[in-house]
Amino acid sequence: MLHPALALVPGEPAGVGPELCVRLVQQPRQDCRLVAFADPATLQAAAAALDLPLRLLPPEALPERPGDLPIQAHCHVHPTRFGHPDPANAPAVIAALCEAASHCVHGVLHGIVTGPVHKAVINQSGIHYTGTTELLAAQAECDVVMMLANPHLRVALVTTHLPLRDVPDAITAALLERCLRIVNTAMCGDFGIATPRIAVLGLNPHAGEEGYLGREELDVVIPVLQRLRAEGMVLLGPLSADTAFLPTKLIGYDAVVAMYHDQGLPVLKHSGFEQAVNITLGLPYPRVAVDHGTALDLAGRGVADPSSLFAATALCARLAASRALLSVRS
């Protein structure tokens, strides 16, 4: 594989996703070939709003100049109005994601880069939708882990979008073990780290204080870590979350596994939100998403920061190339 071919799915058409995609293709890429799965008219409208060139090509075509973008069309029921999402267009958004994923599962494409979606709008259309991560996992019939990353830090989550009161009961030995195995496999295969060092945070303050501040560490976390260490995994912890992110500590980790959403992600976003990306570990192909929302208030104005989409695309290309190299070696 000279360059991986990646699906580019803008997400919510009324948000900033389409214009960020237009910005993305203004420079020639040496690391991948992009194929958009989107509504052509929406991308053209975004290009016009930004006064940037855009030439949509057949899906198999090779870009020749700035603004060239191969596309697999998923036309909307109603014309897009930036800043005003329309539930009638949600089926096309979901269809674009599903077809892009199918192309990757069958080896036609080698990874997916996704823009931000609007969950409420999709659900208002009558489609039950909890998130793109869950959608892709169900389609591929596999277990996945959400990891967010920036140039300074990688944080994976044992639980994701749960009310805080539900988190302790959700953290079972089976879930934690599955999460750690997926993270370890991804760090070895996708990121090329032969022996990854994975820091595992405790659930409770001070990692439970030997049971005085909660028993989850003693009853669930430590037994799982001991079992996986016996297999050769390098797992540090359970660590107290209040000191685990000190710069002097972070240099000793390749990834951090946090027990819940707001335990790990605020630190990551503080350390570099603009270049933060969302990686779905465990899929049979790399999927990297932007780590920001639809920004409806900015849509069509040309002021949205494209850094996260640029970072997501570059990382997805690297991960796809890494998987291809591993496949050749095996």
Swiss-Prot record:
- How the cofactor binds, per note? Binds 1 divalent metal cation per subunit. Can use ions such as Zn(2+), Mg(2+) or Co(2+).
**Which sites bind substrate?**
133, 269, 278, 287
Q: Where in the cell is it found?
A: Cytoplasm
Q: What catalytic reaction does the record list?
A: 4-(phosphooxy)-L-threonine + NAD(+) = 3-amino-2-oxopropyl phosphate + CO2 + NADH
The record's InterPro entries line, in alphabetical order, gives: PdxA, PdxA_fam
Locate the residues binding a divalent metal cation: 161, 206, 261
Q: What class of enzyme is it?
A: oxidoreductase
Gene Ontology MF, one: cobalt ion binding
Q: Name one GO cellular component term.
A: cytoplasm
Family membership, please give it. Belongs to the PdxA family.
**Assembly with partners or alone:** Homodimer.
> What protein am I looking at?
4-hydroxythreonine-4-phosphate dehydrogenase
Q: What is the lineage of its organism?
A: Bacteria, Pseudomonadati, Pseudomonadota, Gammaproteobacteria, Lysobacterales
Name of the encoding gene? pdxA
